[in-house]
Amino acid sequence: MASVLSVALGERSYEIHVGAGLLARAGALIRPLLASPRVFVVTDETIEGLHLDTLKESLDRAGIENHGVVLPPGEQTKDFAHLESLLDAMLDARCERGTTIVAFGGGVIGDLTGFAASVLLRGVPFIQIPTTLLSQVDSSVGGKTGINTRQGKNLVGSFYQPRLVLADIDVLSTLAPRDLRSGYAEVVKYGLIDDPAFFAWLEQHGLALLLGNAEARTHAVLTSCAAKARVVAADEKESGQRALLNLGHTFAHALEAEGGYGEALQHGEAVAIGMLMAFDLSVRMGLCPAADLARLEAHLKALALPVALPPLPEGKAWSAPALLSHFAKDKKVKDGKVTFVLARGIGQAFLCREVERAQVLAVLEDWVARP
């Protein structure tokens, strides 16, 4: 039996369904929301081979006409070129304003598809069916859509809410271990922001979650989605406290950009390191006990998440000044200053604009120098 959460945004409110077996029931759950019984499904080559038939059979049973497109997997797909080709495919399929777009995949597919839906015919409805832990607990909820540019990650996009989110816990069993761990970093984030009891629960049950325990996975996804739904309902456009959800992401986006969005560092892995850097900076500024940084590092290390910078492809090396240069492109820059998400301890994140450049550079230099 699935659990249902609500994102309370007035006339744009929507439900998040979390549970097992949702993919086979997707057609029945989607049908009442459709202006016309027609959807356009966007997925990637990985999900096509694993789950697309199940979704299409469910849509067929519900009498929903379905077309779609299959894109290459990976962060490189989240760019202008693929946005253009996706919009062309939607127009070639004669999508109308009554056609609902279904994002069926991980964060890349969800972000790209949501952005395409927001601009196609000046906005058509879309539904999220996230297939990774990262997308189930984070990117599918809240309406952030977008693509990457050569200047940085997610710098072109829109706030555009889905009509429904279906998070089927069963599909997580087909994730590669590295992908599952990458998503787990975003789960940890919710404990670090304002839920120390959840972080303590993760210390006890995180390994079971990664090893396939359905109860642990369901609890983690529900807790994470509930936390994000509360924040989004209170601050949809990130004018204030929603920025707390970016804990670790200012550092992470710099790491990803400098790493070329390649296989050296997945998004969740960058977030894991970024959260450690944020806690490290907080400790150096005298804001956070060093014991909390050590506790976070121990937990991430115990679950095989990175606690040091990985080697880059041959011919490239990490550089603290190069990493710092990416901070100026962060979406949280205001009047030329970055708003950092720091912490007074586990479960005590807060926003801070009074951070010295030299302090940030010192953190980056130490991390680059680590073996």
Task: For every predicted segment, state its role.
Residues 17, 115-208:
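A glycine/threonine-rich phosphate-anchoring loop and its flanking beta-alpha core
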Residues 1-99:
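ATP/NTP phosphate-donor binding region
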Residues 60, 92, 161-165, 170-177, ...:
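Generic secondary-structure signature for well-ordered alpha-helical cores
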Residues 3-5, 185-187, 287-371:
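C-terminal charged capping/lid subdomain of soluble metabolic enzymes
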Residues 201, 205-321:
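Active-site segments that bind and position negatively charged phosphate/pyrophosphate groups
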Residues 8, 33-34, 94-96, 119-121, ...:
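Solvent-exposed alpha-helices and their adjacent loops that cap or buttress functional pockets
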Residues 108-115, 136-137, 254:
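Short glycine/serine/threonine-rich phosphate/pyrophosphate-binding segments
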